[in-house]
Every structure is written in structure tokens, then in C-alpha cells.
Swiss-Prot record:
Homology family: Belongs to the acyltransferase 3 family.
Biological processes per GO annotation: antibiotic biosynthetic process; lipopolysaccharide biosynthetic process
Primary location class: membrane
EC number: 2.3.1.-
UniProt KW Acyltransferase keyword: yes
GO terms of molecular function: acyltransferase activity, transferring groups other than amino-acyl groups
Protein name in the entry: Acyltransferase MdmB
Transmembrane segments: 8-28, 45-65, 85-105, 139-161, 170-190, 209-229, 236-256, 258-278, 292-312, 336-356
Keywords: Acyltransferase, Antibiotic biosynthesis, Cell membrane, Membrane, Transferase, Transmembrane, Transmembrane helix
Keyword check for Cell membrane: yes
Membrane topology: Multi-pass membrane protein
A GO cellular component annotation in the UniProt record: plasma membrane
Subcellular location: Cell membrane
């Protein structure tokens, strides 16, 4: 079993690229490229956002299980998890509220943004099958609703997974991955409902993408993969092979029905890549993701993730003048605008990480142990015994 104190900086670097993929997805969806061919081509990268979110959920389970210490208490773990995500969520929630109040507009056709005020504030929006509530004040925060459920149940899942015989961990991982792959087959049997996106009926999308218990499958798979590595039974492919498999999975998302792009296509290669990167860090092998710049960006990525959509959406409206969201630009100008938005989001993320995220972690998560795997959203040792 590798020492649990081994840091996993490659996973921090990976988190940055996942956050960048979500940014690219939202840039493509904003549609401010006047050239329709370019705009249509960019829509092909939107599935990267789904892959990235799945990577986030896998990473959460993996990092918490990797850094778990039996002597720590459940209540302290919950307090530290709260300190990690909620203050930053609250600050970005308030920022979004000020902007939306000033604009006085719905976030989606057919509903008011104010419908999601309380669910978004309490991080329960993903439990409700209503797009105007899930989009809420700050659209990306829907994933925090899932993460909140993950953190509440992690001590139980970790305890259960540790009871699985080591020789059966791979079978357990295969079973969970198979369950994720089966989700779109299950949703295809749901009664018809209005489409929120082409090929994505609301009821199916809510169940497969937003509902926390379903996305928890990915989180639990991350826990299992961490224990596979910790117990020394990892025999999977290397980093390059796993990355190529994930790239191939992205290619598959271009030809399968949309519901399969949420997690079914990418779950296996994403889980393999995360574990391969962690194994490379343990073995001291090069991964290309451990540079100081990538690690720093990875540390900022949680704040970047929460602020980037506001920069894109309301930046579009601000730059659009009288045309607002309908304004489009030439390919060169739109590309420059996208890069400027990326720069603003990075700076804003770094600032929020420095003045909100870190201070709140120090204030509310005192006496926390040194992070064993620097994951910007889940980077300290969990608590596993009853306080």
C-alpha cells in the first residue's frame, strides 16, 4: 500500500483542464460567433463540459478516499467540507444576485431567476426537476448541490467500500461503471417530456445529469479506484494510454445519442486516467501536469469554476451594447473576446481563492491536517470516526 501522505499534484493539474473544458463548453453555447459555420463547429466541444463534470465527481471521491484517516471524526470532516465549498458558494451567489437584480431578467425562458433563490442558497437545486431553479443564480453551482450530498454520505460509503475484499475491488469498480453506462438506457424508458436541449428531454436530463443520487455513482467509483491504488492492486493502463482512451471517448460522444454523452461514454477512461495519474505521482513518474503553473491554476479552479459563467454570460451582455445577448462578432473578434473572458475569469478565480476560499478554510477548518492530495475542491483529509 503506498503511503497516504504522498501528494497527488497531477490531479490538481487535471482539475484545471477539466475546469477549462467547462469554460470552453459555455463559450460555445453562448453563440457570439457571427460565422455560423464556426458557431456550429464549436458546438461539438460542448460534450467536453459533460466529461469534465464527470471527472470532477470522480476526483472528489478519489481524493477523499486517498487522503482518508481513520482517526478523524465525521463531524470534523463535514465542518471542513462546509468550510471548503459554502463560503465561496455564498459569495458568488451574492455576486450573481446583485447582477441579476440589476438586470431584472429570467435566466431561462418560462421562469424567473428568483424561483431558484432558496434552493440555490441551500444547495438543493439539483433535487428539483425544474431548469429555471437548477440554472438558478449561478448556473455552475448545480454541481455543488451534488457535491454537498457526496460529502454528507462519504463517511458511510468509505466505510462500506473498505469492507470489500481487496480481490473484489476491481469487480466492484466494473459494476459501478456498468451502472453509469446503463443510466441512459434506463432514462430512455421514461415518459415523454419537453426537451431542454436537442435529444435531452427534461425528465431524462434531470435524472441522468442533475440528480445527486445518480451522479453519486461516479463519486463512489472514485472512492473504489483510490482504494484499488492504495491497496496495491492497480494494474491499469498508463497515463498516455488512459488519456488516449478518454480522447476516443470524446470522439464517441459526437456520434451517440445525447443522453449517452453525460457520463456513459467517458466513465471508464476517466476513472482509469485519474488512477493512472495518481499512480504516476506515487511512482515519481512524469505526467506533464505537475508544473507550478498548472498546480496553481488547479488550486484556483474551484473559484474559477464558480465565477466563469457569470463572466461569460454577463460579459456578453455588457459587450453587446443595445443588442445584448444577440450581439455577435467576427471570428477574430469573438475569439479575442473569449480569451479576454478567460483571463478575467482566471484573475477573478485567483482573487476569490485568495481572499475568500483560503481564509475561510483557515477560519472554519482549523487544525486541519496537511492536504495529501491537493484537489482544489476536496484537498484535505476526511473524517471517518464518530465524534
Amino acid at each position: 500500500m503506498p503511503p497516504r501522505v504522498v501528494r497527488l499534484p497531477s490531479l490538481t493539474g487535471l482539475r484545471w483542464f477539466a475546469a477549462l473544458a467547462v469554460f470552453a463548453c459555455h463559450i460555445a453555447q453562448q453563440q457570439f460567433f457571427a460565422d455560423q459555420q464556426v458557431g456550429t463547429a464549436l458546438l461539438h466541444i460542448t460534450t467536453l463540459g459533460s466529461i469534465a463534470v464527470s471527472v470532477f465527481f470522480l476526483l472528489s471521491g478519489f481524493v477523499l478516499a486517498w487522503s482518508a484517516r481513520d482517526k478523524d471524526s465525521v463531524t470534523t470532516f463535514w465542518r471542513r467540507r462546509f468550510a471548503k465549498i459554502y463560503p465561496l458558494h455564498l459569495v458568488t451567489f451574492l455576486i450573481a444576485g446583485v447582477i441579476i437584480f440589476s438586470l431584472a431578467e429570467p435566466t431561462l425562458p418560462g421562469g424567473s431567476v428568483w424561483d431558484g433563490l432558496v434552493p440555490d442558497l441551500l444547495l438543493v437545486q439539483s433535487w428539483l426537476p425544474e431548469p429555471t431553479i437548477i440554472a438558478g443564480f449561478n448556473t455552475p453551482s448545480w454541481s455543488l448541490s451534488c457535491e454537498f450530498a457526496f460529502y454528507l454520505t462519504f463517511p458511510l460509503w468509505y466505510r462500506l467500500v473498505r469492507k470489500i475484499p481487496v480481490r473484489r475491488l476491481w469487480w466492484c469498480a466494473a459494476g459501478i461503471a456498468a451502472a453509469v453506462i446503463c443510466v441512459p438506457f434506463v432514462t430512455s424508458q421514461f415518459p415523454a417530456s419537453a426537451e431542454t436541449a436537442p435529444g435531452m428531454p427534461l425528465n431524462e436530463l434531470w435524472f441522468a445529469c442533475w440528480l445527486p443520487p445518480v451522479r453519486m455513482l461516479e463519486f463512489v467509483l472514485g472512492i473504489v479506484m483510490a482504494l484499488i491504488l492504495r491497496t496495491g492492486v492497480w494494474r491499469g493502463p498508463g497515463v498516455v494510454s488512459s488519456a488516449l482512451l478518454l480522447a476516443a471517448a470524446y470522439g464517441v460522444t459526437q456520434v451517440v445519442p445525447p443522453m449517452f454523452t453525460i457520463a456513459a461514454c467517458s466513465i471508464v477512461p476517466a476513472a482509469l486516467l485519474i488512477t493512472a495519474l495518481a499512480n504516476a505521482d506515487v511512482q515519481g513518474l512524469r505526467t506533464g501536469l505537475r508544473s507550478a503553473v498548472l498546480v496553481r491554476l488547479g488550486e484556483w479552479s474551484f473559484a474559477f469554476y464558480l465565477v466563469h459563467f457569470m463572466v461569460i454570460r454577463y460579459g456578453h451582455r455588457l459587450m453587446g451594447g443595445e443588442l445584448g445577448y444577440a450581439r455577435q462578432w467576427s471570428t477574430a473578434s469573438a475569439g479575442a473576446l473569449a480569451l479576454a473572458m478567460l483571463a478575467v475569469a482566471i484573475v477573478a478565480g485567483g482573487l476569490l481563492h485568495t481572499v475568500v476560499e483560503n481564509p475561510c478554510m483557515r477560519l472554519l477548518g482549523r487544525r486541519r491536517p496537511v492536504a495529501t492530495a491537493p484537489d482544489p475542491a476536496t484537498d484535505e483529509a476526511p473524517k471517518l470516526t464518530r465524534a
